[in-house]
Design a protein with these regions (language model features):
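Conserved lysine of the Walker
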Residues: 32
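Structural recognition of the conserved hydrophobic beta-strand(s) that form the central parallel beta-sheet
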Residues: 116-122, 143
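Conserved P-loop NTPase "ATPase switch" module shared by AAA+ and STAND
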Residues: 83-101
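Short regulatory helix/loop adjacent to the ATP-binding pocket of P-loop NTPases
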Residues: 125-141, 153-158
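Interdomain hinge/linker elements that couple catalytic modules in large macromolecular machines
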Residues: 157-328, 333-349, 359, 364
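Short glycine-rich substrate-engagement loop in P-loop NTPases that contacts/grips substrate
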Residues: 56-86
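N-terminal pre-Walker A segment at the start of P-loop NTPase domains
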Residues: 1-15
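A cross-kingdom feature that marks ATP-driven nucleic-acid transaction machinery
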Residues: 14-23, 27-29, 38-45, 281-451
């Protein structure tokens, strides 16, 4: 079984017997159902799983449910003999987006207190926007992502102790040994091939067959397109076109979204694709990175420009599009191959999984920096530059950015293939696989006490 960090959150939430109901949402094929099932069966004597897509395609028992009594009646019809009470029965409502009004009903199911509930959905990020009454305070929404690099390491039997040792080096700004660097950079490149889809990683662990891995990734992309056609019928072609053009945007030097390229139509603006952009981001199949030209902490309060980048939600999917079954392009570090788009996608996915909202710096006169994130410890912005080549110490835009006193930057990172950690002023050069350690600041209990 693949280790998922979110399992700790799910287990703690359910074990706490809190009144709020946990909703796990995210893209398809990332392991939501599996991990909830594993944790639920571990903690509860009775585990009831109801897939609402299967119900909609079958008996439709829950299609017109509008009250708690109706829900409990139909629940007893499918799982009567397995139902206990609140403390020993977990009811898992899977693919809840199929019946959006059930999201509203969760509040009243919680109040009734007959059983414990948890829910998940592939398109909750989309459908929550259309729910008539979201039960605020009654639900806890958590977005799930494909496996990040740290989870990939654990899947490859890399010990927690070894990962923690790397984290200590990161915190002390010390270089790994050449042997350690060779080991981790090799696994990072393999992660660029497999990505974080559970089925793709399991196939890699089972067979190492790139053709089979690519088949899984390609099938997942097709699933995403099918979902778009099903849940946004009016604009499905525009959604598919937008999603399918993301790789081509990644191949451009600036990598930003060019509106006229989506449908090859002049005169189009972002407003013409507002709903489509909302879909690909809220469904979890793409990551949005907004442009900021005058950044200040917190970034959410900085004025954004009408520019953005879209990244695929998984580096393996992007590498399958760019390189197919050719693994040499990534594993052999070919000089003629620019892996910038793949590297940036991996970094975007890791930072997003670490809980960061993503921005990038774009200023006509001062250049561009790949990523900007908030640092809650120093109350400042951290700029991050991603370098896939050997000229990783060349970054004029980052230099300009970090020396601008108005921005108040206290720390910056350059991520590259190099295993040598360097510190030049406020810029720290670290191996790209250490992105997993760029995490939101956590505080001790003592520091949280208000005097």
């Amino acid at each position: 079984m693949l280790y998922r960090k979110i399992s700790n959150l799910i287990e703690n939430h359910l074990a706490s017997r809190t009144n709020s109901i946990l909703l796990i949402y995210g893209a398809r094929q990332i392991g939501k159902t599996f991990i909830i099932r594993e944790v639920g069966k571990k903690l509860f004597k009775n585990f009831i799983e109801i897939n609402m897509i299967e119900d909609a395609n079958g008996p439709g028992l829950f299609k017109n449910v509008t009250t708690v009594d109706d829900f409990l009646l139909h629940l007893s019809m499918v799982a009567g003999g397995e139902l206990g009470d609140h403390d020993d029965t977990l009811v898992f409502i899977d693919e809840i987006q199929e019946y959006p009004e059930l999201i509203t009903l969760l509040k009243f199911l919680r109040t009734k207190g007959k059983y414990t509930y948890i829910a998940s959905g592939s398109l909750l990020g989309v459908h929550l926007n259309g729910v008539s009454s979201i039960p605020m305070g009654s639900i806890m929404k958590v977005q799930m992502f494909p496996l990040d690099f740290e989870e990939f390491l654990i899947a490859n039997n890399v010990g927690i102790e070894a990962i923690e040792e790397q984290k200590k080096l990161f915190e002390k700004e010390l270089s790994p040994t050449p042997e350690e660097h060779s080991f981790f950079i090799d696994l990072f490149r393999k992660y660029l091939l497999t990505g974080g889809l559970p089925d793709a990683i399991n196939e890699y662990l089972r067979s190492r067959n790139i053709h089979k891995i690519r088949a899984i990734q390609n099938e997942t992309r097709e699933f995403y397109a099918m979902d778009a056609a099903k849940y946004d019928k009016e604009n499905k072609l525009k959604v598919e076109r937008l999603y399918n053009t993301i790789p081509s945007f990644m191949e451009n030097k600036k990598k930003r979204l060019i509106v006229r390229k989506i449908e090859e139509k002049k005169g189009k603006t972002f407003s013409d694709y507002a709903s489509e952009l909302l879909y690909v981001v809220n469904s979890g199949i793409a990551l949005e990175v907004d442009a900021i030209s005058n950044p200040f902490y917190p970034l959410a309060e900085s004025e954004t420009k009408s520019l953005l980048k879209l990244y695929m939600n998984d580096p393996g999917i992007l590498s399958s599009i760019f390189y197919g079954d050719n693994i040499k392009a990534i594993l052999n570090d070919e000089k003629s191959i620019n892996l910038g788009a793949i590297y940036e996608t991996a970094v975007a996915c890791q930072l997003r999984a670490n809980g960061y909202d993503l921005f990038y710096y774009d200023n006509k006169s001062k250049g561009e920096v790949d990523f900007l994130i908030d640092d809650t410890k120093s109350l400042s912005v951290i700029p991050i530059e991603v370098k896939s080549g050997r000229d990783f110490m060349v970054h004029s835009s980052l230099n300009t950015f970090t020396t601008n006193e108005d921005y108040g930057v206290k720390k910056a990172y350059v991520l590259s293939n190099s295993g040598t950690v360097l510190k030049k002023g406020i810029i720290t050069y670290i191996p790209i696989y250490w992105t997993m350690f760029i995490q939101k600041q956590s505080f001790s209990d003592e520091e949280l006490i208000i005097p």
